[in-house]
Amino acid sequence: MARKGVDVAVALVLVALAAFPAVHSIGVCNGVLGNNLPAPSDVVTLYRSKRIDAMRIYEPESKVLTALSGTGIAVLMDVGPALPSLASSPSAAAAWVKANVSSFPGVSFRYIAVRNEVMDSAGQSTILPAMRNVQRALAAAGSPIKVSTSVRFDVFNNTSPPSNGVLADKSGFLRPILNFLARPARPLLANVYPYFAYKGNPRDIQLTFATFVPGSTTVNDNGLTYTNLFDAMVDSIYAALEKAGTPGVKVVISESGWPSDQGFGATAQNARAYNQGLINHVGNGSPKKAGALESYIFAMFNENLKDGDELEKNFGLFKPNMSPAYAITF
């Protein structure tokens, strides 16, 4: 029993150390909604060969976590389908942390996301209790990993010009979450897709402005100049956070990308322009917030079992056989 206690203590120390990976600006989301995707070990090898040093995964998966162990790749991990039990039971949260975090001391966990884009009111009501329970379980395990949740961009409103941004949260679920994130400092994870803004309004949004290609479009707002849509969207989030009384909450872009096929403006040329532009850009921050803006490209692979329009299956930087969908450099 004493030996077991020592082993557990050592494992928790290793998790704590692994939870402090060097902060880098760009990662890639590793979705698994496909029946032809490569094995986790091959995926991790591809990340390393391309010098991609951060990965988002959408639920704990032991084969993926085992492949990540010892690589130094920083991990943003969603809790997956465990949300109801995590919200209702501190003991379930403790068991979840033990099974999915403490059991993988060689994995460089950076954040735990309590679900992704939860839009139904019943689900939204469980997010904050689950965040609290998971954060307490991590703290009890001696882990400094931060807990957050990933939101869609449309939880913000009046986003043009950026300084007009406000919360569009009619149910009020987001404001208490922001207060939780603010003390102590934890980031808000936000999914930001200029592609969908461009697709919805190509008359008023120039393609060059949406894809980081230098063009004639600039937006001037409160003394700040915007040369791309991504920055404008990000700074509208920061404006909304200020108006909500939580100006110190950092934003992490938990998804952003551009499809290469099967939709309006969805070409390999546009996808490459956007994603390469994003990679090159985020180290500089935005006009409102200088400094690196941590961001995750969606996604690593085209996923043939994704729900929704066909374009949803074509966001990958790579094909399932691991050949590039188009040229990209990290």
Swiss-Prot record:
Signal peptide positions on this chain: 1-25
Enzyme class (EC, first level): hydrolase
Keywords carried by this UniProt record? Glycosidase, Hydrolase, Plant defense, Signal
Question: Keyword Membrane: yes or no?
Answer: no
Q: What is its EC number?
A: 3.2.1.39
Q: Which reaction does it catalyse?
A: Hydrolysis of (1->3)-beta-D-glucosidic linkages in (1->3)-beta-D-glucans
Protein's recorded name: Glucan endo-1,3-beta-glucosidase GIII
